[in-house]
């Protein structure tokens, strides 16, 4: 380990997405995050979109990477989850389910 980590902070986690519009809808309209920035990279044929609850200078954010074309991604076994703190998990799950979001393992139920 580096001897001085007091200035370290988590910047972002990156997820590859097939449908950027659907992913942005989920993170912004369902989870209430803000689209912080979005950039196309034509020479690399990909788009990066960053979403989060605060600015990137002080908060960790989610980077959504959309590779152009018909890329299929396998569900990896190493990725576990994103943890988001909410005031009432049961109410939040109910609200998300009412919006058509599939809750694979409802909290405490």
Predicted segment positions?
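Vicinal oxygen chelate
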Residues: 18-21, 59, 67-109
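Basic/polar N-terminal segments that are highly enriched at the extreme N-terminus
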Residues: 1-6
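Core segments of cupin and vicinal oxygen chelate
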Residues: 7, 14-59, 91, 98
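Core-facing hydrophobic residues within beta-strands of well-ordered domains
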Residues: 8-10, 79
